[in-house]
Amino acid sequence: RRQRQMCIRDRNWNFIHKGEKMMNFDELADLLFPSIDKTPEYYEEKYPPRQLKEGARVTRFAPSPTGYLHFGNLYTCFASYLTAKNTGGVFFVRVEDTDQKRKVDGAVDAMLKGLEVYTVKADEGVIGEGNEIGDYGPYYQSARKEIYQTYAKSLVKQGLAYPCFCTAEEIDEIRQQQGNDDIKGYWGKYAKCRDLSFEQIKQNIENGMPWTLRLKSPGDIEKKCYFDDMIKGKIEMPENVIDVVLLKTDGIPTYHFAHAIDDHLMRTTHVTRGDEWIASVPLHLQLFKVLGFKPVKYAHVAPIMKEENGGKRKLSKRKDPEAAVSYYSEVGYPAASVNEYMMTILNSNFEDWRRANQSASIYDFPFNLKKMSASGALFDFVKLTDISKNVISKMSAEEVFELSNAWSKEYDEKLAVLYAKDEQYAKDILNIDRENKKPRKDLAKWSDIPDYISYMYDETFTPCYELCGNATNELAKSVLEKYIDEVNLNDDKDAWFSRIKSICEPCGCTPNVKEYKQNPDNFKGHVGDVSTIIRVALTGRTNTPDLFSITALLGEKRVKERLTKALEYYKENK
């Protein structure tokens, strides 16, 4: 067991348990941080506790500007956003940009745009590249260097942190020496710089030796750390004994140190993050303790899973296009569809709630972190598609047009051109069967529209005369010869259908489907087969929305032209 040192402070001088004078920590702090003249008390006063109602939660989205927004980011962010929103709290955005080498230009704006698309709006924090609002900033970590160093200096003054002059090569040697040790890292007998004297430290600094600042961990190798995760429940882990780096050689903090200080000063109450960070919780709780902070509550989210070859794997940024949030915009899934789907995998009881509250906003749902999956939600494209079809079916034609038109201008120039020719015509097409008691659910995404409406435009219509059911080419020839003479676009729907039924008997069919089923050998088909022949002639398809509405929109000239061409085909291909 590592021997625990008991520090006794007498004014500015510090002693270990044997009474040996070791270090003036105040002098050491001034040596390491000569330009830092503020104290933690200054920042505690500058960023006071938030005046919120009891139970209100303060959450955050804290991305690194190193790439695109992926689905896992959005999923975790949505959980944080709902947690704050449902409790009357605060949701803010903080950019963790301390690693400037990995920073990608435009990444912040791209991520914020992604959040905006999916209706996640921050109450404070970063709202654009270099632009922020709120009283608890700066919200860019790169602008908070003085804050971190103030708390670092305070730890040095308390004998809780020390400078380390070990090189990368020396750290590698330590790793090799540790071999198969259970605990690997800079700790115990391997922490070579832990007990350097003031004179040694001063000499090293005067010699220009670079240094990092390390935590003097108070952890005990035989003790456990206990915490209650909001998603995974009670967790037990060994205490942290590693003297981790707090500040790198350039004075920039590590994630661990910055996280503790930022979430304390920004008065965060709940941190929702990926479960890859569970291993760091003992360290983070230890940092909160040595800094004198009240710890946040953690909710560790399992990764989104995907079925593959009978098993499951993590949704991959490299393998799966749907891992990128931009994918859903590119193919045209409405944001409302993605949000609705996301709610079903965030909380399993959402679907029951939705059935009972069909017109309610998703933000009325009583989201609960504790009801998130502890083992990882399964991404289901089929379910997303079904949900999206349902969402789009409830939209008005005007809304479908506006959203798909905006999408087409960015992703489908040909569709944008079709729309621009006659916007009202496009809206009328999209309105077919939309106002029924049970609207059709043909569209799952905006990229489905070009094919869905293609037969309504001559330049995109591709004739196809393949029939189904009882319809034969010979019957089609007979039906079209008679129907061409019957076409009258002044008819209402009942009159139009009566004309179709009137040509059934002359063609050897029955206008009564029930009669056909009772005596199929007596007829060549029924009124449904006759309608299918007309449908195929006009649209090239056996299944479409309401044929009467399609006929009315196409107009008499185009209807007769298409019927004539189809008739010619069936005459040549009996």
For each predicted feature, which ranges?
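Residue-level signal for inorganic ion chemistry
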Residues: 80, 111, 155, 159, ...
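Short, small-residue-biased leader/transition segments that mark boundaries at the very start
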Residues: 1-8
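N-terminal Rossmann-like or analogous alpha/beta NTP/dinucleotide-binding catalytic cores
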Residues: 19, 23-180, 279-293, 337
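Glycine- and acidic
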Residues: 59-66, 92-97, 265-271, 322-324, ...
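Active-site cores that bind ATP or allylic diphosphates and position pyrophosphate for catalysis
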Residues: 154, 162-300, 305-315, 324-326, ...
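Catalytic adenosine-cofactor/nucleotide-binding cores of aminoacyl-tRNA synthetases and other
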Residues: 291-470, 539-574
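Helix-rich, typically C-terminal accessory recognition domains appended to large enzymatic cores
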Residues: 499-554, 558
